[in-house]
Amino acid sequence: MAAITASMVAELRAKTDAPMMECKKALTEADGDMARAEELLRVKLGNKASKAASRVTAEGVVASFIGGNAGSLVELNCETDFVSKNDDFLGFSKKVAELVATQNPADVAALAALPLDGSTVDAVRLALVGKIGENLSIRRFVRFETSNKLAAYLHGTRIGVLVEYTGADEQVGKDVAMHIAAMKPVSLSSDDVPADLIAKERSIAEQKAAESGKPAEIVAKMVEGSVQKYLKEVSLLNQTFVKNDKQTIEQMLKAGNSSVQKFALFVVGEGIEKKQDDFAAEVAAQVAAAKQQ
C-alpha cells in the first residue's frame, strides 16, 4: 500500500476542487495512483451530482452585472440557506451574471453551454454540486440592452432589481431600484397589470361587496373602487415613493425630468414550493447517506 502524503492530497484537490477527505479516500483506493484517483473522484462527484439533481432548490441568490449598455439579473438556487452564503456559490453566481450580460444567451440551456473557466457553465455547476453536496441550479435570468441608463439594486442576496431609465441624475435609477425591492410592484403602470391578477382581485372584491347586503349598483361601484385601488398599489408609477411619502414615483420622476422604461424584480425562491422535512427523518437520512459513502 503506497503512502498517501499531504502533498498528494493537496495536488489532487487542486486538480478536482474536491474536499480534502474525498481526495484522501480516492488516493487510498487508487493505491497512490494520481491519475486513477482523479478518475475515481470525478466519477464519485458525478454520482453526487446525479443524486442531488432531484432535490428541491428553493434557497439561493440573486446576482447582477452591468457593463457598457447591457445589464443582467440572474437567480441561482440551492437547497439550503447555509449554502447560499458559500463563497464558491456566490462567486459562480457573479460569473454567470456577467456572462448573461456580455454573451446574451437565448435561454438557460444556452447559458449552461457557454464557456467558463476552461470548461462550460454547466460543467462548473456540476463540479460545485459535487464539492458542496447540494443540488444547484440556474433558475432564470433577464438581460436589458439599451442606449438609456441602467441601474441595479441587490437587497442582500435574496432580492434583486434591474431598471432601465432616462435622466441626468443617476441617483434616480438607484432610488427607483431600491423602491422596487421594497414595494415589489408587479408592473410599470396600471395598464400593464396582468389580466389574471386583475381577475383574481375583482373576484375577491365581488365576494366582499356581496356580503355587504347593499344594492347591486352600490356593490358594482364598491368592486370597481377596490380594483382601481389595487391597480394603484401594484403599479410602480402610482406607488408612493418610499423616500418621500408626499410623492408618487411618477411625480418624483417628472420632477427630475426622468422616466422609467422597464424593470425586472427577482425574489429568491418565489413560486417554488419548499420541501418540509421532519427533523428526525432528515437526520436519519443524512446518517444513511453517510454510511453509503
Curated annotation (Swiss-Prot):
Residues 80-83 are annotated as: Involved in Mg(2+) ion dislocation from EF-Tu. It is found in: Cytoplasm. PANTHER family: ELONGATION FACTOR TS, ELONGATION FACTOR TS, MITOCHONDRIAL. Disulfide bonds: none annotated. One of its GO terms (molecular function) is translation elongation factor activity. Belongs to the EF-Ts family. This is Elongation factor Ts. The keyword Cytoplasm applies. It comes from the Bacteria.
